[in-house]
Design a protein with these regions (language model features):
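Short amphipathic alpha-helical segment within the helicase RecA-like ATPase core
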Residues: 1-154
């Protein structure tokens, strides 16, 4: 696991050597995402997603989220930014509760489905296939709690 980049959130501003307002700093196998004095959580989530995108675009393919400042929304924001349509990425979300892990997995599955539908070719995504695909996703996420019926025709 030595080749994984550890990613930690920091509430401190980055050192001056990284530039004014820098959102990322590096030290060995650890990257810090500097949230600084961000007061609004929505701004923090945007910063986290943007930083993840920068890491991914710089060629980093394997990361592990470390530290106590990661919650469900922050992990999901990072996952949104650490995405590429081509090539494998490995993202270890670090320790989290079982319920958070299930919810995060469901969010990521739903996001992946939306991307596949959005980027799919029109021949493969016609109304019935879209309905069936959506139903499979929802049943996969909801399990026995979901019942549905597709009505086709005029």
């Amino acid at each position: 696991m030595a080749d994984m980049m550890n990613v930690r959130l920091s509430l401190q501003a980055a050192a001056a050597q990284w530039g004014e307002g820098a959102q990322l700093s590096f030290n060995g196998d650890e990257t810090r995402i500097h949230l600084g004095a961000i007061a609004q959580e929505n701004d923090a989530l945007r910063t986290i997603q943007r930083a993840a995108r920068r890491l991914e675009s710089s060629g980093i393919k394997r990361v592990k989220l470390v530290g106590d400042d990661w919650n469900l929304e922050r992990r999901y924001a990072f996952a949104q930014g650490f995405y590429a349509a081509k090539g494998a990425r490995e993202l270890d979300f670090g320790p989290q509760s079982e319920s958070d892990a299930r919810e995060l997995d469901a969010l990521i599955k739903a996001t992946r489905w939306v991307r596949e539908v959005t980027n799919g070719c029109p021949e493969a995504i016609y109304p019935m296939s879209l309905a069936e695909s959506a139903l499979l996703l929802i049943r996969g996420l909801g399990g026995d709690q979901v019942t549905a019926r597709i009505t086709a025709g005029e």
